């Protein structure tokens, strides 16, 4: 047998397999010798032996097969043996890993223990070092004391009358007296010593000395160190204010208290050692610390002294007086400051105080620069600053009773967040007061004299009286600023800027001649605006909620007010040569300012209601940049004025005299009556209005200006002599603006304008269009100005424009009931996106037809006669009767109206109607023969009968909300803005109220 049954080392587990292998070996003539010989040998030797047998040709084939089966059995045995060895190795490795883990845990615990020991040793080392340093410090202190005592003994020899001890060499106490010089010297040296080296004075002048052995006893013998029965450490305050003395039992004591007491210094710390001086309770100083905790008065600093102080005291009654050439710096967080320092000429006291109460501010003379950063809650009296002083105050005070009076050539800068300011500073000539205040109440503003520039940045809630600024001054209000790097010095004819966020303004500033007050206020109430004299430019950017009376500004003034006020009852009256500018977002404006000759009122208001607009005299220019919700009456502006208005509603537009340029950029919702502009004026209606009831009538030489939101303008305007190009546009790119001759003002509000019109003399092309492309603009002849870019929802009556005028209607109109009649020499501009035009218009000499229409069907286009340029941009759905335009006129039909019932009759002219209408029943553009006149009259009668029908049968009209003045579609039963329901009335129609 090759293998034995039951041998687990063979690798075989089944007896059948072992029996089959043994039978094969025996059948082939083999023997168990090969298996037994290589049983314990490795597999390499078994394989080498098998190869030798197989390769030998002399060995029979049967023997080869028997050896092969034996080698197979040996291979299985080798594999089983290797598996056992591998299992043993794995077990050993697992044990080794466990041992390593245990070792690591032990090492970790040892490491933690060593770390704790290291920390303890380090702590002990630090404590030892601290103790050593303390010992060294004590040693140095003792050495210093010893040296001081020896030096004092060398300087002042000891008295010769002393009593020796009972035995030779025995030390005993000796009492003696000190003269006045010795006492003063000792006191002086004691005051110069450190705090830790102070020695407590004794009630009697008793000193202990060793008995002298030679003539030189001063500092040669060691002192007798006696132990006190009650040792007191250093820096220990005496409970009763009495100095502590160490009673020593001397053998012999000579006391002379009666003679010594008058010679004691009044106060002081005496040198260390065993010296003990006599002093009374009234004459002794505090025994431990000489730091004062209360100071009744400031020290007087003389000329050329720099006194820095950091006072955080709770009460400071009297301020320091700093003479000329001083710079006192105080950083005080005191709660109450009753009297501030008075600083003479040439000083600069910067005070950075966050005090809660400031009753009197410093009076600073000439060439001083006071700097104050105060967050005080109450300021009763502000500093009076003389000539050439620059007071700079950054105060967040809540109450300001009296503001500083600043003299000539001063620049006061105040950054105050005070809540109440009762009286503002009065600043004389050539002063620049700058105030950055967030005060809540301002009762009286500063009075600033000639050539002053007060600058105030106030977020005050209440302003009762604004500053009165004299000639040449300029109050500037820079508010809500966190830092002010450089403050300008502005001389005569300056521009004061004011930005105040006050909630209540009762009386505004009165600014004299050559002043420029500028106020940017977000106040909630303003009762009276400033009165500014000649050559002043008051600029107010106020977002106040209530403005009862606006400033009255004299000649040559430019009042600018940017207000977001909710109510404005009376606007300023500005005299000749003034330019009032109002940039207001007010909700209610009852009376606008009256501006005299050569004035330019500019207002940018988002007010909700404007009852009466300013009346501007000759040579003025009122500009109303307003986003108001309702404007009842627009200012009447005389000759050479430019009113600009951006309002949400305009009930009555201004009447502008000769040579005026009224500019109105308005997003008003309703316009009941448009301005009547005389000769030489230019009314510009930059409006995105929802309803326009009456469009202005503009006479000869008028310049309408348009506020454009155009995205591209390729060619810029060339404006000849006497023109005023005003581009108040929100354009993304400006490539080329039109070339406009003399006395023209081009204003375009278009998205793209590839080529602008060439307009002759006395023309002003203004385009306020959001059109996407305009490839070629009109060529307008002399004396005309065509501008009708309108997005109006309803237009009840269109203006009648005389000769040489320029009518501008920027509206998106849904219904156009009555078209305008335009006389001779007018140029209508049409921006229409028409889909189909079967027959183009025939335009005679000197005509520029521009038709860009979105109309669905246009069967026959108009025939336009001489000197007529009809431009229609209409998206109307139905056009029943078209207008007849006389010679030299231009029909402007830039409307996206839904219905157009009846147009006006325009003789001798054929208008260009570019409409998005579904059907055209009657076209007046045809030259009808006499046989068709009867049909034409019948159609007129039918249209008149349809026009006389009740409102229920007519097309729906947009309705305006009475609360928010928002325009709504007829299908809307609820206001889209304020969400209020419209109510029906008795006559069958619908009343929005």
Curated annotation (Swiss-Prot):
Keywords: Metal-binding, Zinc, Zinc-finger. Residues 325-335, 944-957 have a biased composition (Polar residues). Pfam families: TEX13, TX13_rpt, Zn_ribbon_TEX13. The keyword Transcription regulation does not apply. GO terms for molecular function: mRNA binding; zinc ion binding. InterPro entries: TEX13A-D_N, TEX13A/C/D_Znf, TX13C/D_rpt, Znf_RanBP2. Residues 353-364 have a biased composition (Basic and acidic residues). A zinc finger (RanBP2-type) spans 955-984. PROSITE patterns: ZF_RANBP2_1. Belongs to the TEX13 family. This is Testis-expressed protein 13C. It comes from Homo sapiens.
């Amino acid at each position: 047998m090759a293998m034995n049954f039951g041998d687990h080392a063979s690798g075989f587990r089944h007896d059948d397999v072992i029996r089959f292998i043994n039978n094969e070996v025996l059948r082939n003539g083999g023997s168990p010798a090969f298996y037994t010989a290589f049983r314990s040998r490795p597999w390499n030797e078994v394989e080498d032996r098998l190869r030798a047998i197989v390769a030998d040709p002399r060995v029979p084939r049967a023997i080869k097969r028997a050896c092969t089966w034996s080698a197979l059995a040996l291979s299985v045995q080798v594999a089983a043996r290797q598996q056992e060895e591998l299992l043993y190795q794995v077990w050993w490795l697992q044990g080794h890993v466990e041992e390593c883990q245990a070792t690591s845990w032990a090492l970790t615990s040892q490491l933690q223990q060593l770390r704790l020991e290291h920390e303890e040793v380090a702590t002990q080392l630090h404590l030892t070092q601290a103790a050593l340093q303390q010992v060294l410090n004590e040693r140095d202190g003792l050495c210093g004391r010893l040296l001081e005592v020896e030096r004092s003994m060398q300087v002042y020899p000891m008295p010769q009358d002393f009593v020796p001890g009972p035995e030779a060499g025995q030390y005993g106490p000796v009492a003696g007296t000190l003269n006045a010089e010795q006492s003063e010297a000792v006191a002086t040296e004691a005051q110069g010593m450190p705090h830790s080296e102070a020695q407590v004075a004794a009630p009697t002048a008793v000193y202990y000395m060793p008995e002298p052995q030679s003539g030189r006893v001063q500092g040669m013998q060691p002192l007798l160190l006696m132990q006190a029965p009650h040792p007191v450490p250093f820096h220990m305050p005496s409970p009763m204010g009495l100095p502590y003395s160490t009673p020593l039992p001397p053998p012999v004591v000579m006391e002379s208290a009666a003679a010594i007491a008058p010679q004691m210094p009044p106060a002081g710390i005496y040198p260390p050692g065993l010296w003990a001086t006599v002093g009374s309770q009234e004459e002794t100083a505090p025994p431990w610390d000489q730091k004062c905790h209360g100071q009744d008065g400031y020290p007087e600093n003389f000329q050329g002294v720099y006194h820095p102080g950091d006072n955080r005291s709770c009460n400071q009654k009297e301020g320091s007086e700093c003479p000329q050439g001083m710079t006192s710096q105080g950083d005080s967080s005191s709660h109450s400051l009753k009297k501030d320092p008075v600083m003479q000429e040439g000083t600069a006291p910067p005070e950075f105080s966050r005090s809660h109460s400031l009753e009197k501010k410093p009076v600073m003379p000439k060439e001083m620069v006071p700097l104050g950063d105060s967050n005080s809650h109450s300021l009763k009296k502000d500093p009076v600053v003389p000539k050439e002083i620059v007071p700079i105050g950054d105060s967040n005070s809540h109450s300001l009773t009296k503001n500083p009076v600043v003299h000539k050539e001063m620049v006061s800068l105040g950054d105050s967040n005070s809540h109440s300011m009762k009286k503002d500073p009065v600043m004389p000539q050539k002063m620049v007061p700058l105030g950055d205040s967030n005060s809540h109440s301002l009762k009286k503003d500063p009075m600033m004299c000639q050539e002053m520039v007060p600058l105030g940045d106030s977020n005050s809630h209440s302003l009762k009286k604004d500053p009165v600024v004299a000639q040449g001054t300029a109050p500037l209000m820079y508010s809500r600023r966190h830092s002010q790097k450089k403050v300008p010095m502005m001389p005569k004819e300056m521009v004061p800027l004011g930005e105040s966020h006050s909630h209540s303004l009762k009386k505004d500033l009165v600014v004299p001649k050559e002043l420029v007050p500028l106020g940017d206020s977000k106040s909630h109430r303003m009762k009276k605006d400033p009165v500014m004299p000649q050559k002043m430019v008051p600029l107010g950017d106020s977002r106040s909620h209530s403005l009862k009376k606006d400033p009255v500004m004299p000649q040559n003034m430019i009042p600018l007010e940017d207000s977001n006020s909710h109510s404005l009852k009376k606007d300023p009256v500005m005299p000749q040569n003034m330019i009032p500018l109002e940039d207001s977002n007010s909700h209610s404006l009852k009376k606008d300012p009256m501006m005299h000759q050569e004035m330019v009122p500019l207002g940018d208001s988002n007010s909700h209601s404007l009852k009466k607009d300013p009346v501007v005299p000759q040579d003025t220019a009122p500009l109303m940049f307003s986003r108001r919700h309702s404007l009842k009456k627009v200012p009447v502006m005389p000759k050479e004025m430019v009113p600009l208005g951006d309002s949400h509603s305009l009930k009555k537009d201004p009447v502008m005299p000769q040579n005026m340029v009224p500019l109105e950029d308005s997003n008003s919702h309703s316009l009941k009556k448009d301005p009547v502009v005389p000769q030489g004026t230019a009314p510009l209606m930059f409006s995105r209005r929802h309803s326009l009831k009456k469009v202005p009538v503009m006479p000869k030489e008028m310049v309408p200006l348009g506020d454009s939101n155009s995205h591209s303008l390729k060619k810029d305007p060339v404006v000849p002599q006497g023109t005023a190009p005003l581009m108040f546009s929100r354009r993304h790119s400006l490539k080329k603006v039109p070339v406009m001759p003399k006395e023209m003002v081009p204003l375009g509000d278009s998205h793209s304008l590839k080529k602008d019109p060439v307009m002759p003399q006395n023309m002003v092309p203004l385009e306020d269009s959001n059109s996407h492309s305009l490839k070629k603009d009109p060529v307008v002849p002399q004396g005309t100005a065509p501008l009708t870019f309108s997005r109006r929802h309803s237009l009840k009556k269109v203006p009648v424009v005389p000769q040489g005028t320029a009518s501008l209607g920027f509206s998106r109109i849904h219904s156009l009931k009555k078209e305008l009649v335009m006389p001779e020499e007018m140029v209508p501009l049409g921006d229409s996106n028409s889909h189909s035009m079967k027959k183009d218009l025939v335009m005679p000499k000197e005509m520029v037809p521009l038709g860009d229409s979105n109309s669905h069907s246009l069967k026959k286009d108009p025939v336009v006669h001489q000197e007529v340029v009809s431009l229609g941009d209409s998206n109307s759905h139905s056009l029943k009767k078209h207008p007849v335009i006389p010679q030299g006129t231009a029909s402007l039909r830039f409307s996206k109206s839904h219905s157009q019932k009846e147009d006006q009759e325009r003789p001798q002219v054929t208008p260009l109607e570019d409409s998005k209408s579904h059907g055209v029943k009657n076209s007046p553009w045809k030259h009808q023969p006499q046989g068709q006149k009867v049909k034409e009259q019948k159609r007129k009668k039918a249209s008149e009968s349809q026009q006389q029908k009740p409102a229920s049968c007519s097309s729906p009209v947009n309705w305006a909300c009475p609360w928010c003045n928002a325009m709504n579609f007829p299908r809307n039963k609820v206001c889209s803005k304020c969400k209020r329901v419209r109510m029906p009335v008795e006559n069958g129609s619908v009343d929005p109220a």
